[in-house]
């Protein structure tokens, strides 16, 4: 009788001696001596993996991809149940009309926004909440899920946590910079949710979350978990995106992937998929003007910056959390490139794609579309059969940008009315965050 496989461990990118189990990682989102958690080994898929799962549901494909990371901790039956619950919405690859015969006809949009919060982060946050509840729930009757958001993470967190017994979500977001739709999704009144509207930037919110996670006195009161993509569970839950994209293009096609990128978790997940053995011929981080990544790749200099508002607000991040992971998986692995797309180019891409065939991109996906066009104009891009842009959010979440692009804030709409937000307004003040975390608010 064969012995069971050992549970996969995680290691700090900053200290090879710092290791932990999945339970350890959930309880301590950041390693004690800095860095980020990454798996100690990267599982490999066989050459026939995609063919064996070509006609599987997305949930079944995702289960097969993430099983090496979670199955030993959760058990196969529990992992299957988790995937069926968390991934119960469609993930289509859409080719906007009007580009037949041009290089842009090779671009497809992988629509990752058909979950409850209408953004790609539903996949990862729903996974994280379920993994956390099943790994820690018997030992800790009360869990706090803490997140900073520039727009979409917060909505996914509140959707995933609202009404879950023993779980509360505390979400920090910048008072200026999120859209009215995003704020309504994040901060509408409901059980288990505390929304903090911060007089500061997303980077300020993120800094306060990191400070809270490192605060021993807070962590002694009750487990403090992060829903931001510094948590490796979130990133691993996004790895199936690239596998799904690959099976939706023609077998044997040379595929490039363009990822609208802010905190670098999603592009890190694609690079991890490549390290697992998935063939992606080109990978591009499509960023807005706030990202230091293109400069880092071009010059070797990393210069964080204070973010300024752009049309692609969820990517307004000047010091991305997941850089250490991306660099670790890029070193000795397939190449990753990064480009900057400004607001003028973003709005222009939205207009051109809609004018060609009626398809409406969100501003983040439009950043990706422009980067895909630029990739196809290069010598390397000319050899690609397909370029898949990750469609990260539903365009109706950004009525102000739709108004600017089309003169019509209702160019894309959600059904029904969104409720009014009811946040707690605070300054850029960690002590105010501490008071909320120490209270029973939300339970």
Task: Give the location of each predicted region.
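PLP-dependent amino-acid enzyme catalytic core
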Residues: 2-443
């Amino acid at each position: 009788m064969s012995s069971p496989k050992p549970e996969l461990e995680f290691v700090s990118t900053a200290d090879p001696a710092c290791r932990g189990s999945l339970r350890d990682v959930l309880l301590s989102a950041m390693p004690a001596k800095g860095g980020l958690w990454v798996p100690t080994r990267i599982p490999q898929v066989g050459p026939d993996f995609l063919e064996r799962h070509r006609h599987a549901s997305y949930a079944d494909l995702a289960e097969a991809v993430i099983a090496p990371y979670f199955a030993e901790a959760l058990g196969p039956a529990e992992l299957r149940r988790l995937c069926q619950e968390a991934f119960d919405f469609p993930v289509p690859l859409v080719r906007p009309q009007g580009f037949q015969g041009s290089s842009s006809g090779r671009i497809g949009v992988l629509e990752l926004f058909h979950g409850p919060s209408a953004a790609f982060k539903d996949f990862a946050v729903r996974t994280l909440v379920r993994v956390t509840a099943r790994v820690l729930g018997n030992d800790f009757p009360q869990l706090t899920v803490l997140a900073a958001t520039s727009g979409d993470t917060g909505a996914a967190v509140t959707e995933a946590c609202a009404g879950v017994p023993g779980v509360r979500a505390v979400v920090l977001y910048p008072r200026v910079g999120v859209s009215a739709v995003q704020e309504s999704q994040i901060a509408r009144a409901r059980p288990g949710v505390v929304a903090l509207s911060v007089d500061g930037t997303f980077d300020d919110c993120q800094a306060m979350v990191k400070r809270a996670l490192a605060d021993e006195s807070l962590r002694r009161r009750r487990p403090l978990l992060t829903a931001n993509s510094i948590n490796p569970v979130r990133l691993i839950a996004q790895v199936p995106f690239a596998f799904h994209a690959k099976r939706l293009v023609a077998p044997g096609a040379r595929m490039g992937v363009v990822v609208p990128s802010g905190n670098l978790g999603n592009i890190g997940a694609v690079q991890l998929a490549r390290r697992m053995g998935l063939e992606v011929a080109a990978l591009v981080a499509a960023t807005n003007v706030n990202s230091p990544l293109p400069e880092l790749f071009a010059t070797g200099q990393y210069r964080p910056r204070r973010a300024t508002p752009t049309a692609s607000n969820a990517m307004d991040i000047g010091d991305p959390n997941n850089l250490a992971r991306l660099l670790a998986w890029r070193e000795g692995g397939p190449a990753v490139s990064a480009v900057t797309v400004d607001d003028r180019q973003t709005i222009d891409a939205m207009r051109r794609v809609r004018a060609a065939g009626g398809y409406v991109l969100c501003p983040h996906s439009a950043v990706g579309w422009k980067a895909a066009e630029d990739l196809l104009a290069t010598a390397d891009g000319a050899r690609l059969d397909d370029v898949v842009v990750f469609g990260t959010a539903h365009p109706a979440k950004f009525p102000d940008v739709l108004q600017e692009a089309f003169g019509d804030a209702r160019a894309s709409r959600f059904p029904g009315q969104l409720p009014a937000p009811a946040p707690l307004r605070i300054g850029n003040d960690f002590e105010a965050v501490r008071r909320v975390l120490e209270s029973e608010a939300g339970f």
